[in-house]
């Protein structure tokens, strides 16, 4: 590592961070997956699990891993408590102070006899334990599996409303976007908004049309957007996002662009390079850190080294994340002031 890179890395280790786009099942440690597979008598072998943690130059995504977890490995509420606790432990070591993370309940509910309330409560226990042990706060975002039926999405929101908890603040929507447009789950989003839940959605992730981003805004009425890279294909929609100040959570290690762009052109052609420069409010995230082979520090470093953003930009991204988070407004305001002071102090100390 060069001296400049070493200096940047030291700085990134110290600055406060927030994570808003991370999937719980995408955080599971390799040894934890092996432990759970053995404990639960899963068909999944150690060799198969080892292969999950190898990422090729043209990655195919992680959904097959999530399906293996849902269908064959996860068998007890405590499995999810452990995964949540360990994710937050790992994040806190990277100076992540607050995390809002996705959990897809539909697959596990379909594959087991476990109840929604038992699973949600187990994750909340893990979150509380992590806050006690590491000081990291967190909020849970149950997320619609867009490969499931519209009725399954609505049922998920109904379960959230039945088992309402203040740390379960809103809904998301993820998994395969192709042939599963946002409007498929309009009823689920309408109920969420009527019930006072926050909303976000993956859209424009897999090279799909900017119309999915527009639909997420117009039909679903989302409070923030995840990925949304193809918004750049419609200048009027870009202007609208800027005017609304809507936060877009982006992922430097996104599989689609690693797979479809050449290694030589990836950093120059990736939409993330253009998004903030176009005036969009973005915040970088790890998505599935265990399988993307990334962590919050590396994620921030990629924004500088791959996409050419500056230290000033990193501060803007940090503040964007706080502003777009689902923390209480007073908390956001206080943290923005505190974190800005910390950021500036570390900058003066290291650079």
Where are these regions (language model features)?
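Metal-cofactor-binding active-site regions of metalloenzymes
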Residues: 2-197, 205-211, 219, 224, ...
């Amino acid at each position: 590592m060069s001296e400049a890179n070493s200096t940047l890395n030291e700085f990134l280790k110290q600055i406060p961070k927030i994570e808003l786009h991370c999937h719980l099942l995408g955080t599971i440690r390799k040894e934890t997956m092996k432990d759970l597979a053995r404990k639960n008598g899963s068909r999944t072998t150690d060799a198969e699990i080892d292969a999950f943690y190898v990422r090729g130059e043209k990655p195919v995504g992680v959904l097959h891993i999530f399906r293996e977890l849902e269908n064959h490995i996860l068998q007890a509420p405590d499995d999810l408590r452990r995964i949540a606790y360990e994710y937050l432990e790992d994040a806190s070591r990277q100076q992540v102070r607050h995390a809002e993370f996705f959990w897809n309940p539909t697959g596990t509910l379909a594959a087991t006899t476990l109840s929604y309330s038992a699973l949600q409560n187990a994750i909340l226990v893990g979150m509380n334990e992590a806050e006690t042990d590491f000081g990291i706060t967190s909020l849970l975002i149950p997320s619609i599996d867009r490969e499931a039926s519209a009725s399954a999405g609505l049922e998920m929101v109904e379960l959230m409303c039945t088992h309402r908890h203040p740390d379960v603040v809103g809904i998301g929507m993820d998994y395969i976007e192709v042939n599963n447009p946002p409007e498929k789950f309009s009823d689920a989003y309408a109920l969420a908004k009527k019930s006072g839940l926050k909303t976000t959605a993956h859209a424009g992730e897999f090279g799909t049309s900017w119309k999915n981003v527009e639909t997420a805004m117009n039909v679903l009425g989302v409070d923030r957007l995840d990925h949304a890279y193809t918004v750049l294909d419609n200048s009027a929609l870009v202007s609208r996002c800027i005017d609304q100040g809507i936060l877009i959570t982006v992922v430097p290690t996104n599989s689609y662009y690693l797979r479809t762009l050449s290694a030589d052109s990836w950093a120059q052609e990736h939409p993330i390079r253009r998004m903030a420069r176009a005036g969009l409010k973005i915040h970088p995230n790890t998505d599935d850190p265990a399988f993307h082979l990334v962590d919050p520090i590396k994620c921030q470093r990629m924004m500088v080294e791959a996409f050419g953003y500056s230290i000033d930009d990193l501060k803007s991204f940090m503040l964007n994340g706080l502003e777009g988070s689902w923390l209480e407004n007073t908390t956001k305001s206080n943290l923005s002031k505190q974190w800005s002071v910390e950021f500036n102090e570390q900058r003066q100390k290291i650079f």
